Every structure is written in structure tokens, then in C-alpha cells.
Curated annotation (Swiss-Prot):
GO terms for biological process: 'de novo' AMP biosynthetic process; IMP metabolic process. GTP binds at residues 11-17, 39-41, 311, 337-339, 419-421. GO terms for molecular function: adenylosuccinate synthase activity; DNA replication origin binding; GTP binding; magnesium ion binding. It comes from Candida glabrata (strain ATCC 2001 / BCRC 20586 / JCM 3761 / NBRC 0622 / NRRL Y-65 / CBS 138) (Yeast). This is Adenylosuccinate synthetase.
Length: 432
């Protein structure tokens, strides 16, 4: 059985918390895309664990964890994150953590050129705005992957005669193409090569053939949970391009990033923040550049785990959520951070877009259109009540339940979980 957790908006919806709640029922947690460019925090017994690249299933001592072939891996960051988690008590993580031999490697020069590229794009744009990259080298690594010039994990750990010489040769050739593109920037290639030569033996115990690993798990009737990174609106194909990440962050990325056929996927859980946030540039139809937006930002503590950047805030956008649902095929929803809305007397919800006076029938792919739509709202009554101590769905205020029902009716997908606070147990489950 394979179930999937996916972000439905622009990321930061709270996917990790749902995964954390679910992992006790699973044998394997796998990541299928992205790198250390996303982040979430899980609190267990009062201890905060920050995850950026590693699967959050590591908090469950009985769970195996896999970084799939679609993930791009910066080895120094991999070990740094692992050591940080170990320092907080996850001492058995090394025996339960695996990396696909087909995953691509992120080098420091990928990160360097990521930032150079961002500056270059900002200089070209009329408004001086950039894409909003995290600078972690994710985009350049996927670029070298697509051009078939990248290096994969198996290239590094290969013990065949001449394997290291081939790795070194390809590394130098890859670096040279970067320098041809961005100029002869100061960079110590010998230092990085020496580091990777030392990483080789340390990395070997983690490396597996991920296709064999996962399909053996499926054959053994093990339960597999896929932890999506980022979210659908950051998908390279279906997101607000070019203000997106460089991988497929929707259901398609699960299939290609792990080698799992679609017939094996049973449930797709869409994680939806009760309002909308976004980090970086790009159109945001329901954004509130006013006191309401500042209030959402303040109460919701909307700062990125990985970058520390302030998140832009706005009302829930059901046009966007319906589009996300069409593509990912959610079987149920997890509405998170509902408690952030506790003190709002009225809560507007975006239900349609108008452009040049006409209602749009689909989510626009053109940013000039999306950036200039007029959002039509339905205003729902707030509940003006602290819900953080509520332990059962049925005990939620009536207006809170009406808010959730409005979402269900609009996208035609049932709400299964509701987040009512930051704690691990602040999640209500609804029978569906």
C-alpha cells in the first residue's frame, strides 16, 4: 500500500506534521523530489526537530526512510542535518535512513551559481524582482540532470577500477561549463573533491537501489508513505512558472521520483493551510497587503524554516485549491492552522477570478493574467473562539465546521484532519 502526502498551495502547509502523525502506521517513509530547499518542524515530547532534506519518518523508531531518485542531495548538508537530529536524541537514525543510488549530487558550485543566476535574472527583469530561490543549488542541479551532465550517488560510491578518476573528470568538466557560463568565479575545486573522496566511505552504508528497495517493500505488503516536498503551485509544469522550483512537486513527481507505478497509489492526502501563504516573488491573487495580512503573518508565525524569510499572507484561495485537486487527485484533505483564524470576525474566501470583467473558467497559466485577476470572495462568519484546546472534531464551533464544509463542497473532497495548534497532538480527525 502506498499513500501520499502532498502540499496543495505554495508550500509551508504543514505536511510534516501530518506525516509525523501518520508514520506510526507505516513501515517506510519516502521523499521523491527536491532537496534541502524545503523545511518543516516537528515537536515530539517537547523536542523540536527541524527537517530540510531528510524524511520526517525518522522520528518513528520503527520506520525506514528513503531519499528517492528524484531527490537532489548536497552531501555536507545531509550529514549536518543527520548529526543535528542525532544530537537531539535520534541516535538510531543511521540504521533506518537510505539514499537512492540514482539520486543526483548537489555540489557547492551549484549553490554558488544558483545565487549568480538569481542576480542575473533580477538584473534582466523590468521590476528587478527575482524568482526567490533558496540558493541551495537545487535548480542548477536539476539543470545538469536534464542536460545529462550531472553526477549521481552511484558515481561517487562506485568501487570499480577507474571509478574515482571518472568521477573527478566529470566533476571538472561540469565545473568548467559553469565557469564558461558565469565567468571564472573563485572556487576551490580541489578542496571539494577531497571532501567528496572522504565522504565516499561514510555515504556507502546509506546507499541502496531504491527501485529494488521499494518494490520489495510493496511485495512484502509493507505500508509506504510518500512525503511530498514543496507544493503543487511550485511544480515546474503546473505551478506559477517561472516562480517555481525545478522539480515536479505534484503526483507526477511521486511516480518518477520513486519508480512507483500509479496503480500502487491508494490515498492522496492534500494538505491545505486554512489561509494562503507564499515565500518569494510571483503572483498571489488573494494576498492581503494590509492589516489583515499582517495579522495572519503575526498569529501564524509565518517565517520559513529553511530561509527565515517572511511569508506573504492572504485569504484561502479555492480557485487555486480546485486546480490543485484536479491535478493531484486528493482523496481527502488536511486543513492546517485553522486556529490562526480564531479571532477574525469575518473570513473572506476566494471563489472565482475575473479578468477584464469576465469570469475565468480555469486557472490561468499566464502570469500577466493571474497577476491582474479580480478575486471574487464569499465572506464567512468567524467563530471568535480559541479552538487550540479542542480534542474532538464535533466540538469545534459551528462556524468553524461551516468553514470546513464550505471548502469540502467547493472542491468536492472530504476534510479528514484539522490542525488546531502547533503541538503534535493538535490535530483533529474527522470520520469520512
Amino acid at each position: 500500500m502506498v499513500n501520499v502526502v502532498l502540499g496543495s498551495q505554495w508550500g509551508d502547509e504543514g505536511k510534516g506534521k501530518l506525516v509525523d502523525i501518520l508514520v506510526s502506521h507505516y513501515d517506510v517513509v519516502a521523499r521523491c523530489a527536491g532537496g534541502n530547499n524545503a523545511g518543516h518542524t516537528i515537536v515530539v515530547d517537547g523536542v523540536k526537530y527541524d527537517f530540510h532534506m531528510l524524511p520526517s519518518g525518522l522520528v518513528n523508531p520503527n520506520c525506514k526512510n528513503l531519499l528517492g531518485n528524484g531527490v537532489v542531495i548536497h552531501i555536507p548538508s545531509f550529514f549536518k542535518e543527520l548529526e543535528t537530529l542525532e544530537s537531539k536524541g535520534l541516535n538510531d537514525a543511521r540504521g533506518r535512513l537510505f539514499i537512492s543510488s540514482r539520486a543526483h549530487l548537489v555540489f557547492d558550485f551549484h549553490q554558488r551559481t544558483d545565487k549568480l543566476r538569481e542576480l542575473e535574472l533580477a538584473g534582466r527583469s523590468k521590476d528587478g524582482k527575482n524568482i526567490g530561490t533558496t540558493g541551495k543549488g537545487i535548480g542548477p542541479t536539476y539543470s545538469t540532470k536534464a542536460s545529462r551532465s550531472g553526477l549521481r550517488v552511484h558515481h561517487l560510491v562506485n568501487d570499480n577500477p577507474g571509478a574515482w578518476e571518472l568521477f573527478e573528470s566529470r566533476y571538472r568538466r561540469l565545473l568548467e561549463t559553469r565557469k564558461q557560463r558565469y565567468g571564472d568565479f573563485d572556487y576551490d575545486a580541489e578542496e571539494e573533491l577531497n571532501r567528496f573522496k572522504q565522504y565516499k566511505e561514510s555515504l556507502k552504508p546509506f546507499v541502496v537501489d531504491s527501485v529494488d528497495f521499494l518494490h520489495k517493500s510493496i511485495a512484502n505488503n509493507e505500508k509506504i508513505l510518500v512525503e511530498g516536498a514543496n507544493a503543487l503551485m511550485l511544480d515546474i509544469d503546473f505551478g506559477t512558472y517561472p516562480y517555481v522550483t525545478s522539480s515536479n512537486t505534484g503526483i507526477g513527481g511521486v511516480i518518477t521520483g520513486l519508480g512507483i507505478p500509479p496503480q500502487k497509489i491508494q490515498e492522496v492526502y492534500g494538505v491545505v493551510k486554512a489561509y494562503t501563504t507564499r515565500v518569494g516573488e510571483g503572483p498571489f491573487p488573494t494576498e492581503q497587503l494590509n492589516e489583515q495580512g499582517e495579522k495572519l503573518q503575526s498569529i501564524g508565525a509565518e517565517f520559513g524554516v529553511t530561509t527565515g524569510r517572511k511569508r506573504r499572507c492572504g485569504w484561502l484561495d479555492l480557485v487555486l485549491l480546485k486546480y490543485s485537486t484536479l491535478i493531484n487527485g486528493y482523496t481527502s484533505l488536511n486543513i492546517t492552522k485553522l486556529d490562526v483564524l480564531d479571532t477574525f470576525t469575518e473570513i473572506p474566501v476566494g471563489v472565482s477570478y475575473k479578468y477584464k470583467g469576465e469570469t475565468l473558467n480555469s486557472f490561468p497559466e499566464d502570469l500577466l493574467t493571474l497577476g491582474n485577476v479580480e478575486v471574487e470572495y464569499v465572506t464567512l462568519p468567524g467563530w471568535n473562539q480559541d479552538i487550540t484546546q479542542i480534542k474532538k472534531y464535533d466540538d469545534l464551533p459551528e462556524n468553524a465546521k461551516k468553514y470546513l464544509k464550505f471548502i469540502e463542497d467547493f472542491v468536492k473532497v472530504p476534510v479528514q484532519w484539522v490542525g488546531t495548534g502547533p503541538a503534535r497532538d493538535s490535530m483533529l480527525e474527522k470520520q469520512i
